[in-house]
């Protein structure tokens, strides 16, 4: 990409960004991981969790949610001002699972937010350590991306459920900052913009007055983030049009949906990071590993090595398959919900199946679920190979894809051709090429028509043996192209509900 030099790497986004060299970045990311680990150890002590209970991913999720809630300034302010019955705005908590007399019991805990903030800051050398919080948000977002298909949300904004490969990060909170913006897919950005424009259409004052000015600058900022994800001049020019509109309305929504569709073939650049649950970092820190000293990267071998040596457990419902639960979490750990399943199977060393074939529901257990028959089992999060995460959409390419998901958004920088169902995508581009953006539309359609099946993305890039820490011997995988490549194939994944 031409503008590569002006962009900050996502490690720089993670680290509030002065230009740092690789060693400083690795130390800085390591420091963030140390903080999360120390916090988790302290919380396990507070909650009197055994080692096994502390490694239970459901307990990890509760603890992560508690600290995120304790630092959610806007929501905390809102709760103070709009008290609701039975909810203490100063407290946060959730279900903690303990092993009592040979069975799993659920216990609801409640803590002062102030106390949680104190423990968090203490674990992070007195800092608010926003980066660590964002890191946990991205882990939750990646888990949601792997667990749920956002069909309803897509349909509500006038998009097509088959565009789900563009929806990475769709459940990230708005406060997730630059690191959060980096991992949002094209569809996620488009959806946020469409919601904004719709509010403007329905509420005359949305763009007006003091607040309207803030709204407008947020709108333009989001347009610029989206523009920065596109890799072709025509798509970017289209975003300039949308951004400069005097009074954003249906024409802009049309343009946005058009550009989202085009991203199925002319893919945008979306960052991928392996963000692991706190219960992975905690035990590593308590075993004496010093992440800051050793250095850590979210996009290299480090998360793979960490998972090779970690024991994580999960509660399993009576009719769930533990191997399937493991796949779900493994994909979430590597931000791989929209990657080609053939490549994932190769890296993981065991077959990775589409969501609809997995006998597993989400990782979190609802408060009304019966605990009587809950078992627990070890999550298998190890891999056969490792590969470098990508921030590029790769070139585009077509091939038989599936009824559900009709494109992929690559996670790993590994040579392959990227599947998409060209005829299906192109069918959506008949008709409307008039209006202000007609020349851009024509240009975009021309480029999509020209996308070639034999074109290879990430040429020469391969996966690496886990012993090859310096990435010296790339192994270029060969795939059985007759297999299904899409995760949300013909989908019967549950919907994500807030």
UniProtKB/Swiss-Prot annotation:
<feature type="region of interest" description="Disordered">
    <location>
        <begin position="1"/>
        <end position="21"/>
    </location>
</feature>
<keyword id="KW-0946">Virion</keyword>
<dbReference type="GO" id="GO:0043657">
    <property type="term" value="C:host cell"/>
</dbReference>
<keyword id="KW-1139">Helical capsid protein</keyword>
<dbReference type="Pfam" id="PF00506">
    <property type="entry name" value="Flu_NP"/>
</dbReference>
<keyword id="KW-0945">Host-virus interaction</keyword>
<keyword id="KW-0543">Viral nucleoprotein</keyword>
<keyword id="KW-0687">Ribonucleoprotein</keyword>
<dbReference type="GO" id="GO:1990904">
    <property type="term" value="C:ribonucleoprotein complex"/>
</dbReference>
<dbReference type="GO" id="GO:0019029">
    <property type="term" value="C:helical viral capsid"/>
</dbReference>
<feature type="short sequence motif" description="Unconventional nuclear localization signal">
    <location>
        <begin position="1"/>
        <end position="18"/>
    </location>
</feature>
<keyword id="KW-0167">Capsid protein</keyword>
<dbReference type="GO" id="GO:0042025">
    <property type="term" value="C:host cell nucleus"/>
</dbReference>
<comment type="function">
    <text>Encapsidates the negative strand viral RNA, protecting it from nucleases. The encapsidated genomic RNA is termed the ribonucleoprotein (RNP) and serves as template for transcription and replication. The RNP needs to be localized in the host nucleus to start an infectious cycle, but is too large to diffuse through the nuclear pore complex. NP comprises at least 2 nuclear localization signals that are responsible for the active RNP import into the nucleus through cellular importin alpha/beta pathway.</text>
</comment>
<dbReference type="GO" id="GO:0003723">
    <property type="term" value="F:RNA binding"/>
</dbReference>
<dbReference type="InterPro" id="IPR002141">
    <property type="entry name" value="Flu_NP"/>
</dbReference>
<dbReference type="GO" id="GO:0075732">
    <property type="term" value="P:viral penetration into host nucleus"/>
</dbReference>
<comment type="subunit">
    <text>Homomultimerizes to form the nucleocapsid. May bind host exportin-1/XPO1. Binds to viral genomic RNA. Protein-RNA contacts are mediated by a combination of electrostatic interactions between positively charged residues and the phosphate backbone and planar interactions between aromatic side chains and bases.</text>
</comment>
<keyword id="KW-1160">Virus entry into host cell</keyword>
<keyword id="KW-1163">Viral penetration into host nucleus</keyword>
<feature type="short sequence motif" description="Bipartite nuclear localization signal">
    <location>
        <begin position="198"/>
        <end position="216"/>
    </location>
</feature>
<protein>
    <recommendedName>
        <fullName>Nucleoprotein</fullName>
    </recommendedName>
</protein>
<comment type="similarity">
    <text>Belongs to the influenza viruses nucleoprotein family.</text>
</comment>
<feature type="compositionally biased region" description="Basic and acidic residues">
    <location>
        <begin position="8"/>
        <end position="21"/>
    </location>
</feature>
<dbReference type="GO" id="GO:0005198">
    <property type="term" value="F:structural molecule activity"/>
</dbReference>
<keyword id="KW-0694">RNA-binding</keyword>
<dbReference type="GO" id="GO:0046718">
    <property type="term" value="P:symbiont entry into host cell"/>
</dbReference>
<dbReference type="GO" id="GO:0019013">
    <property type="term" value="C:viral nucleocapsid"/>
</dbReference>
<keyword id="KW-1048">Host nucleus</keyword>
């Amino acid at each position: 990409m031409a503008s590569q030099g002006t962009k900050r790497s996502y490690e720089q986004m993670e680290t509030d960004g002065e230009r740092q060299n690789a060693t400083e970045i690795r130390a800085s990311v390591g420091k963030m991981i140390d903080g999360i680990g120390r916090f988790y150890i302290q919380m396990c002590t507070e909650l009197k969790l055994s080692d096994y209970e502390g490694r239970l991913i459901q307990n990890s999720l509760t603890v992560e949610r508690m600290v995120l809630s304790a630092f959610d300034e806007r929501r905390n302010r809102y709760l103070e001002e709009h008290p609701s019955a039975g909810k203490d705005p100063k407290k946060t908590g959730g279900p903690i699972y303990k092993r009592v007399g040979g069975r799993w019991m659920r216990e609801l805990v409640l803590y002062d937010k102030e106390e949680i903030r104190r423990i968090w800051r203490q674990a992070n050398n007195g800092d608010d350590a926003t980066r660590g919080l964002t890191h946990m948000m991205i882990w939750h977002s990646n888990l949601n991306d792997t667990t749920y298909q956002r069909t309803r949300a897509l349909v509500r904004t006038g998009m097509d459920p088959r565009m789900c490969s563009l929806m990475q990060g769709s459940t990230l909170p708005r406060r997730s900052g630059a690191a959060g913006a980096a991992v949002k897919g094209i569809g996620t950005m488009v959806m946020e913009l469409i919601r904004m424009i719709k509010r403007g259409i329905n509420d005359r004052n949305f763009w007006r007055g003091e607040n309207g000015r803030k709204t407008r600058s947020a709108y333009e900022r989001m347009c610029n983030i989206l523009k920065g994800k596109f890799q072709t001049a025509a798509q970017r020019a289209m975003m300039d049009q949308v951004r400069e509109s005097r009074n954003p309305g249906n024409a802009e929504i049309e343009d946005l949906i058009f550009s989202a569709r085009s991203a199925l073939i002319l893919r945008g650049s979306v960052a991928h990071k392996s963000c692991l649950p706190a219960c992975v970092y905690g035990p590593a820190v308590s075993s004496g590993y010093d992440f800051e000293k050793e250095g850590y990267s979210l996009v290299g071998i480090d998360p793979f090595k960490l998972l090779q040596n970690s024991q994580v457990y999960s509660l399993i419902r009576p009719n769930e398959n533990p191997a399937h639960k493991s796949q779900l979490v493994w994909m979430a750990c590597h931000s791989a919900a929209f990657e080609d399943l053939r490549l994932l199977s190769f890296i993981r060393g065991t077959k990775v199946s589409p969501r609809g074939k997995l006998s597993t529901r989400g990782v979190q257990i609802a408060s009304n679920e019966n605990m009587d028959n809950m078992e627990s089992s070890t999550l298998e999060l190890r891999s056969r190979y490792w590969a470098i995460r990508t921030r590029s959409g790769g070139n585009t390419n077509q091939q038989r894809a599936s009824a559900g998901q009709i494109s992929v958004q690559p996670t790993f920088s590994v040579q392959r051709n990227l599947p998409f169902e060209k005829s299906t995508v192109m069918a959506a581009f008949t008709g409307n090429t008039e209006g202000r953006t007609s020349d851009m539309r024509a240009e975009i359609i021309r480029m999509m028509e020209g996308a070639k099946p034999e074109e290879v993305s990430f040429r020469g890039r391969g996966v690496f043996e886990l012993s090859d820490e310096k990435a010296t011997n790339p192994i270029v995988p060969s795939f059985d192209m007759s297999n299904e490549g899409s995760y949300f194939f013909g989908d019967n994944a549950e919907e994500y509900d807030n």
